[in-house]
Every structure is written in structure tokens, then in C-alpha cells.
């Protein structure tokens, strides 16, 4: 742990189209090599595809629901006690919760088979709103690990 002062959180401006801060953060997660325009095109393209597939659904609302569904409540951390490593379940802080859900959505979309990244992302977001998809599978896996190691929860950090 650093002993210096705590680093202040940078204020992230909301995205230009929807005025949503979470969407802006997700844009930064999707961005690679500083190419923000490409990330913006991918995300807005995915939201447009969601709008076309489900005209009754608000694409921004679908995005928020998907992010909230993928957020993990608990995760496991390794803790060494008496020469043995234990996987200790710990509650996830809200900031990390959001970061993990965005990262998992990105990774799950990458692994999909559709042609463009916008299509992959749109389908992954739609599946996440319904509680399916690669990102949801990842969250459930993390929750299962925490549940299986509940016996070691007294080794709190």
C-alpha cells in the first residue's frame, strides 16, 4: 500500500450523445491505443443495433440494465495463512464492481463470432439484460467460487 496521499479520482465527463457518465466510462474501456473515435463508433453502433432489434426498448436503459446484471457482489482473494493459500470471499467495492462488469462485457463481446465489434457488443448487451451470455457466465463463475469458499470467510482482510 502506498503511504503517500490518496490520489484524487478523475472526473469523467458524460458522453456527448446520451449524457451518461457510465457510457463514457465504458467508451474508455472499449478504447484501444487512444482511438476514442473508434470506440465511440463501436458503442453508438451497438446502441443503434439494439434500437433496431427492439424498437420498444430504450438502448441506454438496456445498457444500464446489462451493466447492473453483470456486476459481481462478491469475489475471492488469495490469502496465505500458515503455509496454505485460501481463497477468501470478499465483498466487491462499488467502483470495482462497475469496472469488472464493463471489462467482462468487453471480453465476452470480443470472444463472440459476429462480424463487427458493434454487433458483438449489441448482442452481448442484449443477452446480459436477459441474464445470459459470456459476461453473465463469468459473474456466475465468480459467485460460485465465493460460495464454495464461504468456509474461509473468517480470514477477512
From Swiss-Prot:
Pfam families: Ribosomal_S7. GO terms for cellular component: small ribosomal subunit. Belongs to the universal ribosomal protein uS7 family. The keyword RNA-binding applies. GO terms for biological process: translation. Disulfide bonds: none annotated. Keywords: Ribonucleoprotein, Ribosomal protein, RNA-binding, rRNA-binding, tRNA-binding. One of the primary rRNA binding proteins, it binds directly to 16S rRNA where it nucleates assembly of the head domain of the 30S subunit. Is located at the subunit interface close to the decoding center, probably blocks exit of the E-site tRNA. This is Small ribosomal subunit protein uS7. It comes from Delftia acidovorans (strain DSM 14801 / SPH-1). Part of the 30S ribosomal subunit. Contacts proteins S9 and S11. One of its GO terms (molecular function) is tRNA binding. Gene3D superfamilies: Ribosomal protein S7 domain. The keyword Amino-acid biosynthesis does not apply.
Amino acid at each position: 500500500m502506498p503511504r503517500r496521499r490518496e490520489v484524487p479520482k478523475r472526473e469523467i465527463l458524460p458522453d456527448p450523445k446520451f449524457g451518461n457518465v457510465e457510457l463514457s466510462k465504458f467508451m474508455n474501456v472499449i478504447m484501444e491505443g487512444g482511438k476514442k473515435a473508434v470506440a465511440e463508433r463501436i458503442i453508438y453502433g451497438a446502441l443503434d443495433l439494439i434500437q433496431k432489434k427492439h424498437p420498444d426498448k430504450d438502448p441506454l436503459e438496456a445498457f444500464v440494465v446489462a451493466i447492473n446484471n453483470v456486476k459481481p457482489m462478491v469475489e475471492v482473494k488469495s490469502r496465505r495463512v500458515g503455509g496454505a493459500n485460501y481463497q477468501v470471499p470478499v465483498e466487491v467495492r462499488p467502483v470495482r464492481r462497475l469496472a469488472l462488469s464493463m471489462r467482462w462485457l468487453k471480453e465476452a463481446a470480443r470472444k463472440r463470432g459476429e462480424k463487427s465489434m458493434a454487433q458483438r457488443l449489441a448482442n452481448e448487451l442484449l443477452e446480459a439484460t436477459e441474464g445470459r451470455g459470456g459476461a453473465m457466465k463469468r459473474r456466475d463463475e465468480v459467485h460460485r467460487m465465493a460460495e464454495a469458499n464461504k468456509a474461509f470467510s473468517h480470514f477477512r482482510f
